Amino acid sequence: MNEERLQWRTNPAIIAQYFTGEDLPKDIDIHLKPNEACVVIEDGKITGIATAQRLTVNPKLGTLSRILSKREPFRSFLFVHTGPHEVLVKLDGRWSDGTEGKGAAGLKIRFNNDDLGRLLSFAADGKTSITLGDIASSMELEISQKFRSAHMGTTHPSSAKEDRDTATLLESGLRSISQTALTDIGAQLDRVWLSWIPSDHERVMGMRSELEVLAEHGRLIAARDNEMM
């Protein structure tokens, strides 16, 4: 494998990719875009976060170290596209009048370089390719439950859909709830939007499914390319 053929991000659905040192050739040069970073882990501990446009990863053990019989550390690498990204979250619950409400929320987020290590929780659970769908799934339940309890149950549907002041209050509430959930994965929230059009709720799920299919397609292509190198 050479630097020109190594593409850690195979499609827009993937926002982070985890590799062990065994997955990569020794002393490989990798180019990072301005909004990409690489978390370097040695023997289970983060030793650095690289943001340079070009870096060499997975270095060979030096001659002196080999002579002294030093053990090569177990290395792994987490590449991250820091954003911005738009995460789609479905919302559902009951309004103050008892009617059912379904909507969609869009969260424009970006990842903080200093907190990228928090994404390693996905790798610990066996997810080596982290997608926007994974990010949404990790916090959707928390956001939906808290928003339903704190805001939907005390709001009339007509006000949510037609009154600008009410809509602003709901967006503010969503922002507060979402930022708490995003902190757990090392991200910050730039802006939010809300829609109570029923079709948008279904569109969120459809778009997410399409992105996951693209992500899986990209993983298969990457695996095939790696086998050929």
Stretches found by the model and what they are:
Residues 45-196:
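Amphipathic, interface-forming alpha-helical segments with heptad-repeat character
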Residues 2, 11, 35, 58, ...:
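Detector for Asparagine
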Residues 1-50:
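N-terminal, positively charged regions that mediate nucleic acid binding
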Residues 62, 171, 205-206, 216:
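Short amphipathic alpha-helical patches
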Residues 191-207:
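Short, charged, surface-exposed interaction patches
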Residues 209-229:
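Assembly-interface segments of oligomeric complexes
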